[in-house]
């Protein structure tokens, strides 16, 4: 066997005993050059690295993927535009629902009345301070509304033309880029999921009602819809009954400076834009609310690098601490100088009582239960503590402490709104609950009933029990004229509790209130609603001095209008003449004409012959 192999080592193997070992190339090059030249085993196969799919399919797949990547910004722009429109309508509808709340309407009316008395600079400062608390969504919403208001203003054509943004080069480039998208035959293929029942709005408000309540905001949203329809050829979906993509909770619009962040957006359907070649893509005409670069002539907003958006607010409420209420509108974390109302004359906030935790357990539990109950009845609205509880102390109360009484004047909830039980109160060292405090309040109100002509202002619904020890009363019991009431414990003999009457501080000067001397048995000087004048208008001594005569009639505000006339000329004036003299109030004119008739009767009877 071995000899046979050795003998055939340099020749072709036998057909019956072929070797499985391939011939060496070094042997074949010498004796079998023809066969060596035809042997292809030493060369790699050109099909060895070929994949399963043909190369054409791989090439076109890569090209298609590149096109899809190029069209992602267009997809995101369309989603951003629709999300903005949906967010604006959501904000507008929530505003309308909040405006219909009676409590909010009362609070808003009080704010508007306060705002009307401010100067232009104070209004600007107040608005600027409030804008610092806005979120990115609110900022974009206000930008659209303010632009609409500016265009509807009659002076906008002179200061800033309404169509200025459509004339600059940047807007022309963006509009041209968007107009190319309208040529696609598949522009109407934007698929959307069916309406989500969980995303429906349940406000029950008609769109016409909302538009009538906020015309400028509704016009701004309608303009955004018209722009979307004009640029894409598709009318935006009616998001009063469905969301744009998936559930409404996923439509949290990203920040302006980071439009590529799509983590908060639901998965959109297929791209509405058809695939095109790999030519350079022009920038898409994105809506102004989501564009990082504003056109010329328009206000730009700060990027997220300068001001980060506010943290997301949740409705999770824990038991608040007494020294730092979590639900206070004047929370330290969000406080600003505009949150402190007007300039205080005394300490802005009194020091709160630090009680042992065991005595505060029921207070914390009751307060937490009330807040959770309010949250369960008001949808998506966080019930804050009453802002009036944090108002500054009144100047005439000082710090609200007396040196000779063991009374704690820092009563928590002493300024709570009527109808809502406030926190427990410390009165004369005892902790009173809501029922005991209500009984004490009723007793104090019954004691003051003889000196009140109308109910106490709801601004101060609770009398501090500690004030009773000094005989103090609320300055609002008698309206704004309470300071002139001699029965007011703050003046007159009421200062005896403070030991100041010996210094002659018991007197007063000027005009008395409606119920000034009722309790002393004297006739009231000009009670409102009575037709009898406060003093005899036919007194010759008063008629000699017109300013004093008008002062006795409580008409001294018209002294400058009538002081140049004699009494004989004054009583001859009629209603028209009084109005020409500047007596614009109808009640004042009627009162004057009635007194003029009395003076004329006294003159005809001869009572005024001594000064005629």
Curated annotation (Swiss-Prot):
InterPro entries: SAM, SAM/pointed_sf, SMAUG/VTS1_RNA-bind, VTS1_SAM. SUPFAM superfamilies: SAM/Pointed domain. Keywords: Cytoplasm, Nucleotide-binding, Protein transport, RNA-binding, Transport. Residues 511-520 have a biased composition (Basic and acidic residues). Monomer. Binds to RNA. RNA-binding protein involved in post-transcriptional regulation through transcript degradation. This is RNA-binding protein vts1. It comes from Aspergillus fumigatus (strain ATCC MYA-4609 / CBS 101355 / FGSC A1100 / Af293). The lineage of its organism: Eukaryota, Fungi, Dikarya, Ascomycota, Pezizomycotina.
